[in-house]
Swiss-Prot record:
This is Peptide chain release factor 2. One of its GO terms (cellular component) is cytoplasm. Methylated by PrmC. Methylation increases the termination efficiency of RF2. Belongs to the prokaryotic/mitochondrial release factor family. The gene is prfB. The gene for this protein contains a UGA in-frame termination codon after Leu-24; a naturally occurring frameshift enables complete translation of RF-2. This provides a mechanism for the protein to regulate its own production. It comes from Staphylococcus aureus (strain bovine RF122 / ET3-1).
Length: 369
């Protein structure tokens, strides 16, 4: 890359950041941060823990936007200063370092812009992610377990905390179901892109004849709603509460006491399990919170369908639709059928490198909004 081209890129980044700044209202955000931090310094701040945590989360979200912008602007200023130095006295090594910085900077701006776009009403929430194998016994149960690991690795790389809330192992291998609580800013905003059916094509390790098999597993993702977000009343007569022994990765008291909880909500048919906590009381509280989140999400989806009918829109059916194929044989390819994003790096994807698929889907849906 010639010096003149490097300079054009730096100038373009400066223009991009100026445009971004114009939409941010940084001064107002910094005022809000100051107000939140004054609240956090009050001696009675933790009297209402739910409200306190909400203020902390909002403050952290604002600081991420403000500090993210300032960091990007400082990097552009540094690149500009380095270019000026090269004009005064050329140095090949310095020029190569600057060229690499210019190349890498685009990805940083793209990531920052994507975070700004995650401004849906629940995008900032934690996420509840469930995996269920399709028909096919051990083969599909093993596929669900592979997806379980993929999402764990993705969340680890994103800095999200993963709690296994419920885990039901397969008969021979894999899992029959798993429920994860994924904690982190914008966890739902990112992971909502994964809702749908995932298809695997491979030579089965469970088939002695070495035949090719196709397996399916479904992924469901809903926001983990805060109690003050949910206006849902549950009639005690509408639910059945059962206890059972914890059965796997999530249970800390495995096969010792019946601390795990299953709640069945009869009007909706929704069933939730929780075995993550040591005590039955805490598992019941967590399960009720999850049930409320699911019922609230159901209510929101019904409202969205009603609005779509009023507007006369044809909505895409998300649940039950195949969103992505993972082909291990006869060639290596992972392809998202919604965006046509694809890669031949199957091993990297299964190790959690699904960011490009999520980002391309989010950008596509945002451009259609």
């Amino acid at each position: 890359m010639e010096l003149s081209e490097i300079k054009r890129n730096i100038d373009k980044y400066n223009q991009d950041l100026t445009q971004i700044r114009g939409s941010l209202d940084l001064e107002n955000k910094e005022t809000n941060i100051q107000e939140y931090e004054e609240m956090m310094a009050e001696p009675n701040f933790w009297d209402n823990q739910t409200k306190a945590q909400d203020i902390i989360d909002k403050n952290n979200a604002l600081k991420a936007i403000v500090n993210g912008y300032k960091t990007l602007q400082a990097e552009v200023d540094d690149m500009d200063a380095t270019w000026d130095l090269l004009q005064e006295e050329f140095d090949e090594e310095m020029k190569e370092d600057l060229e690499q910085e210019v190349i890498n900077f685009k990805a940083k701006v793209d990531e920052y812009e994507l975070q700004l776009l995650l401004d849906g009403p629940h995008d900032a929430n934690n996420a509840i992610l469930e995996l269920h194998p399709g028909a096919g016994g051990t083969e599909s149960q093993d596929w669900a377990n592979m997806l379980f690991r993929m999402y764990q690795r993705y969340c680890e790389k994103k800095g999200f905390k993963v709690e296994t809330v419920d885990y039901l192992p397969g008969d021979e291998a894999g899992i029959k179901s798993v429920t994860l609580l994924i904690k982190g800013h914008n966890a739902y905003g990112y992971l909502k892109a994964e809702k749908g059916v995932h298809r695997l094509v491979r030579i089965s390790p469970f088939d002695s004849s070495g035949r090719r098999h196709t397996s399916f597993a479904s992924c469901d993702v809903i926001p983990d709603f805060n109690n003050d977000e949910i206006e849902i009343e549950i009639n005690p007569d509408d639910i059945t509460v059962d206890t059972f022994r914890a059965s796997g990765a999530g249970g800390q008291h495995i096969n010792k006491t019946e601390s795990a909880i299953r709640i069945t909500h009869h009007p909706s048919g929704i069933v939730v399990n929780n075995q993550n906590e040591r005590s039955q009381i805490k598992n019941r509280e967590a399960a009720m919170k999850m049930l409320k989140s699911k019922l609230y999400q159901l209510k929101l989806e019904e409202q969205a369908r009603e609005m779509a009918e009023i507007r006369g829109e044809q909505k895409e059916i998300g649940w039950g639709s195949q969103i992505r194929s993972y082909v291990f044989h006869p060639y290596s390819m992972v392809k998202d059928h919604r965006t046509n994003e694809e890669t031949g790096k199957v091993d990297a994807v299964m190790d959690g490198d699904i960011g490009p698929f999520i980002e391309s889907y989010l950008r596509q849906t945002m451009s259609h909004d």
